[in-house]
Amino acid sequence: MNRIQILSESASVGMRLRDILYQDGFSDITLADLTALQDIPQNAVTIIYAKSNISALMQNLSDCGGSIILLLNPDCYAMQLDRARHMGITLLLMPVAPYMLLDAVRNAIS
């Protein structure tokens, strides 16, 4: 099973995302804040939750590899949809339903 890295601007959201994945059987999960953005491994599925400075985040993600799932609040989602699609990033709307998160992770792994 692939490694999963969660980078979150909110510790409580990051822990909730990790719990959803653990409950579904995923085990190789690391949790960090957004400062770990420079260390995204090529072979990991990276889940990122951000609520501020989205433009700079998208600029940084353009150089990253691997599978990226980006979770955004409604006020940012629509503005970044086309850009994320062009960059090959899966974009999900917060609050994300557990089944949607799990489907996105499974699709990124396969």
Regions picked out by a protein language model, each given a short descriptive name:
Residues S55-C64:
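Short amphipathic alpha-helix used as the core "switch/output" element in two-component signaling
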